[in-house]
Amino acid sequence: MTNHSVILCILDGWGNGENNQFNAIAQAYKPCWDNITLQYPKSHLITHGSSVGLPDGQIGNSEVGHVNLGSGRIVLQDLCKINNEIKYIKDNVYLLEFINKIKKNNGICHIAGLLSDGGVHSSYTHILDIINTLSDFQIQVAVHIFLDGRDTPPISATKYISILCEHIKHLNNINIATLSGRYYAMDRDNRLDRTTKAYNAIAFANAKRYEDPLTAVQDSYNLGITDEFILPCIIGNYQGMKPQDGFIMTNFRSDRVIQIIKMIIGDIKTDNHITLDNTIGMVKYSDKINIPCLFPNNNITNTLGEVIANNQLHQLRIAETEKYAHVTFFFNGGKEDMFENEDRIIIPSPSVATYNLTPEMSAEKVTDTIIEKIKLQKYSLIIVNYANADMVGHTGNIDATKQAITTIDQCLSKILNCIQNTNYVLVITSDHGNAEEMFDVKNNMPYTAHTLNPVPFIICNYNKKIRLKNGRLCDVAPTILEILNLAKPKEMTGVSLIEQV
């Protein structure tokens, strides 16, 4: 058993990048961070591609990052798994059952998802593959497009829409029905007014109508509205859903489809509702959403949280709303239930349109709560996520992101001061980069997506002389287990990055 306790501090979206004018982290005032990087052992971690279970060259994201951090192994991600399996989609028993039900009911298929090659929430190629199969079975299809502009350039929707239009013009009975920026269709922060706008367009064709999707997008561009924020709208003569219809959600990441799926199946009540009894998802989105899926998830056991629980130790997960699922559901390998002696605290995120308006977000409240819990000396492991660098970085506003970095720096200073003369070891890392690249020089526009840069890995307040090796996100859990003097389970294929001096 250990004499140490650990605080794992995940600075979401904090990468190591070139020191230039577009690196909000390098440009920000952050005296505590500057001191940390000089005083304590540090290395860096790879957060993309095959190092986290993604295709080579694929940028990492928060879900993938937290799954790898918590599981202590490289977890084959849904993108890779689906890429491998979708070539056999015509034989997928779950899709065949779905299709047979539509045919029996004489309905049409509504297929919805993020039309993007960002690889974070979806892949447009998956949508095309499923459309091909539906067309082969002579199913009439209404396509509901969610527009990205966050994991892709802010003004890039016409590229993907053109690909889709070219693809379906040779297929029978396939029509684009609605468009919606992901700001509306993919909200995850319980801002149901946004989700309702997307739902009303999909379910009731209740929104502004355009003849074709490219005209709809250009109309928004003319108003200065980029892809992410395009209001839900209707395309052509789409008239809405009927009870005999079926619905497929093609996003494979769960957190940003839960609200819209719950509206579709009636778990979130709306003023008007169409009841469908034939809905299917790409993967299992939640234990609380009772719909089948095309590609069932893998079962991940002996995660870091499970090892802590099996040793009868107490652990705490804390984050603000935007990243709460990441330190709980994703960190636990896609399991919603809490382990024994696991406590969770959610701090509400600010209710603003975009986080450049409040770059401090709720970091100070998160920090004050952590300090209260440290003083209890109850928890052997505290896992905290600071959302600022990622969520403000996604706005493309470099000045606001610099303010976000300064806020995090102040929070780190408070935590470090609090753990002096305690047995707490502060482990600092990130899940992926973002704030260190804020401008796309090649395309002369703000850069709002994640990056391929490595992220920092630093251990503070450890009373042993050590060096740290470079590694991958899956190496963090084994490193923490070494600090806690707990055995690493065989399922964890990551390695401790600690080298004794």
UniProtKB/Swiss-Prot annotation:
Residue sites binding Mn(2+) 1 per the record: D390, H394, H450
Keyword Manganese found: yes
GO MF, one example: phosphoglycerate mutase activity
Catalysed reactions, as listed in the record: (2R)-2-phosphoglycerate = (2R)-3-phosphoglycerate
Function according to Swiss-Prot or TrEMBL: Catalyzes the interconversion of 2-phosphoglycerate and 3-phosphoglycerate.
Organism encoding this protein: Ehrlichia canis (strain Jake)
Family: Belongs to the BPG-independent phosphoglycerate mutase family.
GO cellular component terms attached to this protein's record: cytosol
Protein name as annotated: 2,3-bisphosphoglycerate-independent phosphoglycerate mutase
UniProt subunit comment: Monomer.
Binding site for Mn(2+) 2: D12, S62, D431, H432
